[in-house]
Amino acid sequence: MQPTSAVSRPAWVNAMNALTGTGGTIRKSPVEIVADAASVVTRSPYAEFTGIRTGKLGRWTDGVATLRADRATFASYWAAHNEQVRRERASQANENAYADPLWVVLGDSTAQGLGAPGPRGGYVGQALTQLRRTTGQHWRVINLSVSGALTRDVLAQQIPLLAEEQPDLVTCGAGANDILFSAPGKLFADLRELLKAVPDNTVLLDLPLLTGFWGIVGRISVPYISRMNRVIHEVALQRDLPVAEVSAHFTPPWAGKFSCDNFHPSQDGYRDWTRALLAAVPASSLAMS
């Protein structure tokens, strides 16, 4: 297959290249950075002898590697799905037919559904099914999210694509990756800038509090996430935007709610995210005709 020229590439390809570099390598998530460091131990000559390789630490690094391999599969699925939705909507427009309501998703790997068995097992796929069922309308979704995206990436690379889509509903959930990649001042400034840039028909997702989970790393992250959530709710109040309170729905007991990397939700965990999102979608959106 011949490489696609830059001119003829779909917008999502150019956005991906701008975000990750022309090689298309997605930025590592915080959990991948920690796992790579841990792999120095689990792959050492002594790991098999001491049992580390097959122990809890070794199984965890293997789980992270599994989800890392899934990223490209999930990204390819949503890219193909997005293009199919665009073609179908263009056909409806050409025929002056009723346009199905459109939901556009902004975010990171959780919006991609990473951690579920397949892309449709995340909160986007689950919520889409519920939206169609509860409204009786054939909602469409275009998922612009990118695994590893920071808030500034969503602002610079995903927000500009909204003008092409003309969505009826937008959701935006990002920020977890910023904790290792941004100084606190930059982190909160970027978050505020993103939240002020989303359109008026946006539902914001706050972040889950991993209290007591994932050991000391989870506990250290709590003050940052708590402050990020305060910023999200503060800006949402200023702009009169609804917030999907993932922090209130995705809670202990954790059994079965996390995937093999002990960071991303499992399909069961994403059910909590789905409930949080659907509870926040305005009635005006659900009543669209």
For each of these PLM feature ranges, what is it?
Residues 156-289:
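Alpha-helical cap/lid subdomain in secreted, periplasmic
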Residues 75-79, 85-86, 91-92, 96-97, ...:
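Mixed-charge, polar/low-complexity N-terminal
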Residues 21, 118-121, 222, 226:
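Short, conserved loop/turn and helix-capping segments at secondary-structure boundaries
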Residues 70-87, 109-117, 144-151, 186-195, ...:
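Short, mixed-charge, low-aromatic patches
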Residues 102-104, 110-189:
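Conserved SGNH/GDSL esterase-like catalytic core that processes O-acyl groups on lipids
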Residues 106-107, 205:
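Short hydrophobic segments within beta-strands
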Residues 67, 127, 260-264:
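Alpha-helical interaction segments
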Residues 1-104, 117, 133-136, 165, ...:
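N-terminal secretory targeting modules
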